[in-house]
Amino acid sequence: MDYWSTLNRLAKQYARIGPLKSQLTAMKNWQASIAAGVLPAHALPWLGLSTPQIDAALTQPQAQLQELLQLDHLLHNFRRYIAFHDGMWSFVHEDLFATWHRLYGPQRYLEVAAGNGYVSAGLRAQGDKTITTDAHTWTKENVTGRQPLVPVKTATANAALFLYAQQVDAVVMAWSPDKDPNDVRFPHIMQHYFPTNQLFVIGERNGATNSRLFWQEARTVPDRRLFALNRAFGHFDAIHERVYRLQ
């Protein structure tokens, strides 16, 4: 099944569903930005169909529940499609980094596990200096790391700390995989060797990113600015992706 052709066909067939057009437009704009090698400008709206919307659509002639559920499934799985086809896992955008820079001011950042460097690209666009690193272990599985927006140095997350953390004010980790319990060593290294550096982690706590042990050991830093930052981040699917500050 071709994702876009099926989505476009079903969206055209059920065009009377009010929010569908704006959702589809936002999705196409998002992928067009990624294909052009730039960050999307704005957060995505909530993607998917509500139960009342499906019920209303079923009153249309020739409407089929199976098709509506398929349409809803495609909308909900936009993140997965973009991740595996375009190498973007954390759905960051220009508005997020404009708010980030306003709240935290100019800083020097080290991004670890950077993939294609979307976070670094967003920070750089605001005038922040970045050192961008990734272990490049995903390139055989999908396009992550193959088309970086910024130069990316090869280094594991832990190694990058010892190589570059003393040159920056803050460290950012976005969308680290959730299958490796050894990731708990990363915040321990930060706490022991680089306690003065800020640590930002972008992901889903006890969910899609980082190991459960990582989150069990994580020490959050109270920071009211995160409320405004995460409002700017937005929320468009079942993944509750947030920006956290850890010690």
Predicted regions located by residue number:
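Conserved class I S-adenosyl-L-methionine
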Residues: G105-G115
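A short SAM/SAH-binding and catalytic strip from SAM-dependent methyltransferases
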Residues: V168-D183
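Conserved alpha-helix/loop element of class I SAM-dependent methyltransferases that forms part
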Residues: A83-Q107
